[in-house]
């Protein structure tokens, strides 16, 4: 049962643990902002199981393993909470929306359950749970407040997420997201651009536009060309160095977006284009509304307009009814597409989806074998593509937390314009770049998941983003969120 006794009079602490996609990471920044506005301070520890006065789990429901890991973690948290009277646990996000009636039944020590549509209610629900000494479960079926209208505590001083829409109008048979995020709701362009300008004024120099399907942005207010126009408008914002977006949908990806990418200098030459399957029959069963020929045509047009574009993708192995022939088609399309990285997943049955009740579910051993073959091919192609970068001069924006072995290898790490991960060795006398600073390097070796520049910096530019990072030092950090379900862009999933 929830415990409503606080044991100290200091400012209460919080930690947010994030599972899933970039949208969840952005939502977690909103959760952190709400809690700080309510008087909480971030707990400096990054260990998920370390005690804090409030621990919030922002969950994912795309795959079954995310469910299992969350409930496993909640099981461990029962003992932690028992040893720390007054501690509160909250579960939000997509899994909370899906399992609203069962979270507290499976984990009765949880204090608050909130969904994807009412993130802003969390502080009130925590207060109510403490006062009433009983769990508070509040799930809304439609959006209460657009997330970007809530306060935020951004994880990065120099890079930011910007939501352009929430929800999805597609009906992919394997996907549970539209049930949990609702129908698409678009923000007006002026509101989005005002937020971006405000972020740039704070030192942000890279933004990622977020939507479940960015290509359909604008349909709600009657402008099918709105996304391309938005990209071009971002090009007119002084101080905005890099613009990225995720995720598009092949069925709605149009040439005006390709032209906007090619003609807007601060829109980066990287594209994440989900394939899901190379088999037309499987795509039909998935209800993906495109076929492999259309997909390959998109890649051809992107590469014609943006020759050095790095293209990544998502692929599902073992969708119901997938035959050896279907899988061979996927392998053929992957070979032809030459992805710089691919996020490969084994099909996971999701409740209340058409695919979940389809006949001909593929046996697990077959799925595993195909998965391993696909990962091997994806890594081989990525390695070839990365080795082709050797000798190129690339611009790198250095980042905090990207190079997990930087201290041991004496390197610094960042992202190239095409979003490839680059590890850089500094020469004696080189200035040490701060996160957010931008340097030019020459690639000396390519590896399946990253590039290396062992020749030091060609030049280094101190940036407003680096200044913003420096100004943050000494503040309590929320640390790097725990992200499960979707890997960092550029790193194939194993």
Curated annotation (Swiss-Prot):
Protein name: tRNA-2-methylthio-N(6)-dimethylallyladenosine synthase
Residues that hold [4Fe-4S] cluster 1 according to the record: 21, 60, 94
Domain MTTase N-terminal: 12-131
Subcellular localization(s) per the UniProt record: Cytoplasm
Matches recorded under PROSITE patterns: MTTASE_N (PS51449), MTTASE_RADICAL (PS01278), RADICAL_SAM (PS51918)
Quaternary structure and partners: Monomer.
Enzyme type, top EC level: transferase
NCBIfam families reported for this sequence: miaB-methiolase, MiaB/RimO family radical SAM methylthiotransferase
Radical SAM core domain mapped to chain residues: 154-385
Role according to the record: Catalyzes the methylthiolation of N6-(dimethylallyl)adenosine (i(6)A), leading to the formation of 2-methylthio-N6-(dimethylallyl)adenosine (ms(2)i(6)A) at position 37 in tRNAs that read codons beginning with uridine.
Catalytic activity: N(6)-dimethylallyladenosine(37) in tRNA + (sulfur carrier)-SH + AH2 + 2 S-adenosyl-L-methionine = 2-methylsulfanyl-N(6)-dimethylallyladenosine(37) in tRNA + (sulfur carrier)-H + 5'-deoxyadenosine + L-methionine + A + S-adenosyl-L-homocysteine + 2 H(+)
One Pfam family linked to the record: UPF0004
Binding positions ([4Fe-4S] cluster 2): 168, 172, 175
Cofactor needs: [4Fe-4S] cluster
Taxonomic lineage from the root: Bacteria, Bacillati, Actinomycetota, Actinomycetes, Propionibacteriales
Domain TRAM: 387-457
Entry EC number(s): 2.8.4.3
Chain ranges passing through the membrane: none
Entry annotated with the keyword Metal-binding: yes
Assigned keywords, A-Z: 4Fe-4S, Cytoplasm, Iron, Iron-sulfur, Metal-binding, S-adenosyl-L-methionine, Transferase, tRNA processing
Molecular function terms, GO-annotated: 4 iron, 4 sulfur cluster binding; metal ion binding; N6-isopentenyladenosine methylthiotransferase activity
GO cellular component: cytosol
Cofactor, how bound (note): Binds 2 [4Fe-4S] clusters. One cluster is coordinated with 3 cysteines and an exchangeable S-adenosyl-L-methionine.
Keyword Transferase in record: yes
Family: Belongs to the methylthiotransferase family. MiaB subfamily.
